[in-house]
A protein has these predicted regions:
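Beta-propeller domains
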Residues: 20, 27-33
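Conserved beta-propeller blade signature
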Residues: 24-27, 63-65, 73, 111-114, ...
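Short loop/turn segments that connect beta-strands within beta-propeller blades
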Residues: 38-42, 77-80, 125-129, 164
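C-terminal hydrophobic structural anchor segments
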Residues: 102-123
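Redox- and metal-dependent alpha/beta enzyme cores, enriched for Fe-S-associated oxidoreductases
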Residues: 52, 68-77
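Extracytoplasmic beta-rich repeat domains
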Residues: 1-22, 43-60, 84-107, 131-149
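Surface-exposed loop/turn positions within WD40 beta-propeller blades
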Residues: 31, 69, 118, 157-158
Length: 164
């Protein structure tokens, strides 16, 4: 899901996938920038300081994203104001947090399902960002979860993991 652009040997820009509400397109990158762009004109509606490379989720008037540091942010879709920030990696020891780099997430049934680069699936209550559970599914990077037919699927290398 991440797009990488290299400019010589000095700058590497990684963007998230684009998400849209039909009027604006939203994207973030690893340079601490989160944008709302007018879909027709390309003009920036607002810009926020959020360091994220993963696809955001639009829910009603809000945009939910997870930063590279494991902060779950809820932003106002209309003006970019940060409404809420929760550290979803707070239960992980500081020196181990780099191992839990967020890869992708979905929100379903009031829960956030977040995959990491070290094969973990975090199940977090969306309302208060408390841990429900952490599942060790693999030792390597998992892809972004997919919700289909009341079940969650996660791809890894050449396999699909089904979560009930």
């Amino acid at each position: 899901p991440t797009r990488t652009l290299g400019f010589g040997n000095n700058i590497t820009l990684r963007n998230s996938d684009l998400v849209s509400d039909g009027t604006f397109v939203y994207m973030s990158n690893n340079k601490n920038e989160f944008y709302a762009l007018d879909l027709k004109t390309g003009i920036i509606k607002w810009k926020q300081k959020v360091n994220s490379e993963i696809r955001s989720v639009i829910i009603s008037d809000y945009i939910v994203t997870v930063s590279n540091e494991g902060l779950m942010l809820v932003l106002d879709r209309n003006n970019g104001s940060i409404i809420r920030i929760n550290n979803i990696l707070r239960e992980i020891k500081r020196k181990k947090r780099d191992d839990y780099y967020p890869v992708g997430f979905i929100i379903s049934g009031g829960k956030v399902y977040l995959t990491t680069k070290n094969g973990r699936l975090f199940v977090i209550n969306f309302s208060d960002a408390t841990f429900n559970k952490v599942l060790k599914l693999d030792r390597d990077k998992l892809q972004r979860p997919v919700y289909f037919n009341k079940e969650i699927y996660i791809t890894k290398d050449n396999s699909i993991i089904k979560i009930n």
